[in-house]
Amino acid sequence: MMNVFDLFKRRSSAPVARERLQVLLAYERRNRSQPDLVSILREEIMAVIAKHVQIDQDYLQVSMDRGETMSTLEIDIQIPNKSAVPMAIAG
């Protein structure tokens, strides 16, 4: 049962990102002629990741394979290990 106060709770970013991706993929299925959907997805995915991890844009690859009945979205992200990222020294 849904509580009225649940409508005002802040949702975590993962479910929100997943919901946005599902909406975009559903839209893409209806409008297959839109060529730059992959670039839109890439920008939105990069924005979500940048909120949590600092990565170079060159390390994010997004591709879409469009089939007759199904489209496949492939996302390749190289995230540096925490030990490889230099820490700022507090002064």
UniProtKB/Swiss-Prot annotation:
Keywords: Cell cycle, Cell division. Pfam families: MinE (PF03776). It comes from the Bacteria. GO terms for biological process: cell division; regulation of division septum assembly. InterPro entries: MinE, MinE_sf. Prevents the cell division inhibition by proteins MinC and MinD at internal division sites while permitting inhibition at polar sites. This ensures cell division at the proper site by restricting the formation of a division septum at the midpoint of the long axis of the cell. Belongs to the MinE family. This is Cell division topological specificity factor. It comes from Mesorhizobium japonicum (strain LMG 29417 / CECT 9101 / MAFF 303099) (Mesorhizobium loti (strain MAFF 303099)). The lineage of its organism: Bacteria, Pseudomonadati, Pseudomonadota, Alphaproteobacteria, Hyphomicrobiales.
